[in-house]
A protein has these predicted regions:
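Active-/binding-site microenvironments in catalytic and ligand-binding cores
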Residues: 1-230
């Protein structure tokens, strides 16, 4: 068995959308501060974290993209959503700033030699992190799903899909439409994944990516992991 870490590190001022709160990490306590109790010395180091619920590798709750009363918050989502069978589709040939079409997904599924099943997690490897991490294009240049290709995934009955980018659709209308497809067809998505190249050609595997139990949360950072039975 091999575990593949699919989460990127959360760090101070990491890149993200201006519509989400920035990540601010500062030192709160250091080992320079020594306390004593009954002649016994002790020190501790701690950090202060301020960030939005969409920081880093995260999963969206329906409340994020569904304004209707009763849309689930992250703490209300079933844990089974985040512990599933999974597949990875290779879309690394797609140019930056391009649309992912239905045909792209069909061809990638065929090339993977697997069939997407209901409740699956579908991970979409676009080789975006390697190509754009650390550049201004990280927040603008990613390939993205369209309303039509997201609908194709949703009609497969999947539980969620995941991308390396900070958004599932291209910036602007396409991104809004993909979010609303998730709303209308009852599934969700993850953003900010890494190391998806290690899953290409691996067939079916176990995905684990539990969110924090944030009351009324619209999303949550996750530690996403693929479990490969080598």
């Amino acid at each position: 068995m091999r575990l593949v870490d699919l989460s990127r590190e959360i760090h101070h001022r990491m890149p993200g959308f201006a519509t989400h709160a920035p990540v601010i990490i500062t030192t709160y306590g250091t080992h320079d501060e020594v306390r004593e109790a009954d002649g016994y010395a002790f020190s501790s180091a701690t950090l202060s974290l301020s960030m939005g619920d969409h920081a880093g590798t995260h999963v969206d709750a329906p409340r994020h993209f569904d304004a209707r009363p009763g849309a689930s918050t992250i703490d209300e989502m079933p844990l089974e959503t985040f512990y599933t069978e999974a597949v990875c589709l290779d879309l690394s040939h797609k140019p930056l700033k391009s649309d992912i079409s239905i045909d792209d997904l069909v061809q990638a599924e065929r090339a993977a030699g697997i069939a997407i099943k209901p409740k699956d997690t579908v991970l979409l490897h676009m080789d975006f992190y390697r190509r754009c991490h650390g550049t201004p294009g990280y927040v603008t240049d990613f390939p993205g799903l369209t309303k039509e290709s997201a609908t194709w995934l949703g009609k497969k009955g999947i539980g969620m899909f995941g991308v390396e980018a900070i958004s599932p659709g291209r910036p602007g209308r396409a991104n809004y439409e993909v979010h609303h497809v998730c709303r209308d067809l009852g599934f969700t998505h993850m953003e900010g994944l890494v190391n998806l190249d290690q899953l290409v050609g691996k067939g079916r595997f176990r995905f684990i990516g539990f969110p924090l139990k944030i009351k009324d949360g619209t999303a949550s950072p996750i530690r996403a992991v693929a479990v490969l039975e080598d």
